[in-house]
């Protein structure tokens, strides 16, 4: 039998597909399970478009199964009106009896209120499954709402003798290896902004 952790891991994998397209929203994946089998899945694909839970519900072919299914999601479902209606309303409307959540959303409009809305409508809620992994995935989003500042990465390269580049170098010079360059390009793709400067 597959565990809650197994399904939340699948949600995380789905959520990662939204990287570069959902900011300033978080990356969210959702899976719907009936009789220990996945019957629906979705992720937040683009900022302003349907959230993961809605896409997962929409992907279920036999909607009658939703009344006996469990919805898994890596981040607490939203409960406020923004560019889209609240995900909690969609879950409640479809009579999904159980929701398993990776971590709470620290955005002030949600922050435990999504869980409360579900429980107030007789939905069984379990949260904190693979919590640290889920927080790590959305560290930029959560940091912004927890600390009221952007998530910052500091990167620099220098030689062993503390120089930035050889003297009188008239052509491009790489101090870092290919693996480091690959990592930097990955970071640049994940961040919303980059500040470049010199001493």
Indicate where each model-derived feature is located.
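Short beta-strand scaffold segments in enzyme catalytic cores
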Residues: 27-36, 156-157
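Local cysteine-cluster metal-coordination motifs and their immediate loop/turn environment
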Residues: 43, 50-51, 71-90
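Short, conserved beta-strand segments within well-ordered enzyme catalytic domains
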Residues: 31-33, 39-43, 70-72, 100
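A short, polar/charged loop-to-alpha-helix boundary motif
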Residues: 45-58, 175-182
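Short active-site-proximal "capping" loops at secondary-structure junctions
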Residues: 38, 44-50, 106
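A structural motif shared across PLP-dependent enzymes of the aminotransferase-like
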Residues: 20-23, 27, 46-51
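Zinc-dependent deaminase
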Residues: 1-22, 38, 63, 67, ...
């Amino acid at each position: 039998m597959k565990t809650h952790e197994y399904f939340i891991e699948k949600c995380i994998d789905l959520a990662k597909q939204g990287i570069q397209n959902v900011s300033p929203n978080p990356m969210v994946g959702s899976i719907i399970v009936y009789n220990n089998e996945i019957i629906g899945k979705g992720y937040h694909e683009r900022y302003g478009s349907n959230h993961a839970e809605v896409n997962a519900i929409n992907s279920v072919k036999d909607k009658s199964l939703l009344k006996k299914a469990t919805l898994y999601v890596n981040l607490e479902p939203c409960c406020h009106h923004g560019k889209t209606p609240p995900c909690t309303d969609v879950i409640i409307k479809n009579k999904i009896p159980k929701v398993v959540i990776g971590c709470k959303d620290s955005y002030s409009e949600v922050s435990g209120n999504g869980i409360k809305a579900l429980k107030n409508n007789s939905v069984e809620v379990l949260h904190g499954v693979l919590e640290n992994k889920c927080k790590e995935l959305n560290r930029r989003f959560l940091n912004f709402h927890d600390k009221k500042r952007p998530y910052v990465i500091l990167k620099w390269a220098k030689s062993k003798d503390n120089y930035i580049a050889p003297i009188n170098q008239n052509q491009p010079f790489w101090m870092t290896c290919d693996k480091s360059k690959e990592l930097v390009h990955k970071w640049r793709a994940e961040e919303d902004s980059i500040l470049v400067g010199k001493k």
